[in-house]
Structures are given as C-alpha cells and as structure tokens.
Amino acid sequence: MENILDYNEAELKQWMDKNGEKTFRAKQFFDWIYNGTFDFKDMKNLPQSTRERLEKNFYIGMPSVVKRLNSKKGDTVKFLFRYNDGNIIECVVMKYDYGNSICISTQVGCRMGCSFCASTIGGRVRDLTSGEILAQILKAQKEIGERISNIVLMGSGEPLDNYDNVIKFIRIVNSEKGLNIGQRHITLSTCGIVPRIYDLMKENLQITLAISLHASDDETRKKIMPIANRYSISEIIDCCKKYSDFTGRRITFEYSLVKDVNDDKESAKKLGELLSGMLCHVNLIPVNTVNETSYEKPESSKIKKFCDTLLKYKIESTIRKEMGADINAACGQLRRNYIEESEGK
C-alpha cells in the first residue's frame, strides 16, 4: 500500500482517471489534507465509494507525536514524530514576528559524520519520501493551530543526499495547489555535495542555498566534516559562485563557532579572504553542546571579534539567536536522547 502524500495533485489525477474516478476528486482530497483533515472517512464531499477505494489502495502517512516540548519563552516548539515503520525524526517550529518557521528533517539520521552534530550519531537509517517530509509541516501546523510560512531544510539528514525526494517536496509545497509557500521562503542547507549543487542550480529554483562550511581551510574542515575529504573548500566556493551567478540568489554560509577549533582571528581572516566579493551572507552559529563531543561555544567577546573581522572584508554576518535551548532544540539532540532513554543507556 502506498502513502498517498507521495503523490502530487497531477499524479493523483492520473490515478483517479485510471481507476474510473473523476479527476477533480484529486483536488478535493488535497483540499482536505492541506486544511488539516487526515482521515479518508472525514472527507465528506468525496463519495463513499471513492473514499473506500482510496482507503483500499492508500494510507495517509501522517506521523504520530511521540513528544512535544514547548520552550519557556513560547517562541519554540519541538516535536518528535514517529512514522508508520517506527522510525523517529524531529522538527522544530520557531515563532517570529514575521511568521512561523519550521526546521524539518529529510532523512532518519545522517551519514555525513559532522563531528559537532547529534543527528549523525548512529548514522543514516533511511531517506524520507517527499510525502513524509511534507507530513512534518502538515502535522506541525495542526498541532500548533497556526500556518507555517517559512521552511528550513536543516534538520536531521543531508537534503542533497536525498535529492529526488527533496526536489519533489519543494515543488509540492511551492505549488499554488500545495501549501503555496514561496520559494524565497524556503532554505536548503547542505554540507557541500558539489555535483548535487550543480544539479540544484539546473532546477532554476529561487530558494535560499545555505552551505554548512564551518571552517575556512581544508585542514580544519577535514577534522570536523568528513565531506571535506571529497570536496575542497575551493571547489565548493567555485561552485557557489556559479550557482549565485546563474540564479541571482545570495548564498548563506553557515559557520559553527567552536572554541579553540575555528574561532580565532586567523580563521576569520581566511574566511573573509575566501568570501570577499561574493554575493553572500555568513550565519555564525555558536556551537551547541553535544554530550558525545567535548565542543564548547566561544565567549561572546570572541564571537563579536570574529564578526568584526568579517566586516573588514565587507562581508555581512549575523550571530544566530539561540532558541529552544531549554528543550534540546538543536539538530538531532532530542531524538538522540529519546533513543538512549528507550535503550536504557
């Protein structure tokens, strides 16, 4: 049996036609889904025979809520979701003045091996389908009772390691027949799989591309990100310049600041020289504490100096505001803790 959420409207129309149903029933079905109705039986404007046929051939792959944590400030909600096969992922809703943003997962676990990230501990279990990625937004919207208007593909998993499902998901949520979320309200974060960035460029999307750089030289990057053994920083920067020229979009470079690893003035100068003249922005992220590592965030004064050094190279940077620290809102932390508790560790 298939997850009907893996179908877009055009595909479901084809299925309806092939199975003797009126094609407009596909739109009716998705109207119910996008308005928070996740049971065939409750879709009252679909004939009973249609509902029964759908139920016989499909299931609505909506995850169940394992855990919901609300931050004390009320600006962050973190969910642990369980899919039909028992696999667990997490997503985070962040509430801003301009609307609600959601950070979603694209894989169960991750195989990229970045040493500062909890998501990669235990490796990659499997890819999420386009429908399973979509379901995170639909379920979160229903849980909080508010619309989500911004999407960040920055949860567990490497989006470009699950390329086809992620691209299909983006096109579904961007479609007027889907959630109608503008492409410029969607950010895709990657550790830098160069061939896939070129593929993404050819999709001609207007999403924001965010590169998890986290170092300004290959030697340092190799210590914290295994992907650096495959693609050098110079290859990534060259690729990003071409991507930006082709799409006209500014690139975001993410840089996790780790005390005594990549937070010194020399690292900031190298980063400034590397990105000078590019249409880009740097997002500085004081590293989150992960029990399995000894990494610590630098002092505030050192973070500010790093920022000031980049400014000398005319590179705009922001220091990411910490949200949901009291609920383990950083990528992979809650899932990891839950798995360890379940295993009695």
UniProtKB/Swiss-Prot annotation:
The keyword Disulfide bond applies. S-adenosyl-L-methionine binds at residues 157-158, 189, 212-214, 288. Pfam families: Radical_SAM, RlmN_N. It is an enzyme of class 2 (transferase). Its cofactor is [4Fe-4S] cluster. The active site is at residues 90, 331. [4Fe-4S] cluster binds at residues 110, 114, 117. One of its GO terms (molecular function) is 4 iron, 4 sulfur cluster binding. It is found in: Cytoplasm. Reaction proceeds by a ping-pong mechanism involving intermediate methylation of a conserved cysteine residue. Belongs to the radical SAM superfamily. RlmN family. This is Probable dual-specificity RNA methyltransferase RlmN. The lineage of its organism: Bacteria, Bacillati, Bacillota, Clostridia, Eubacteriales.
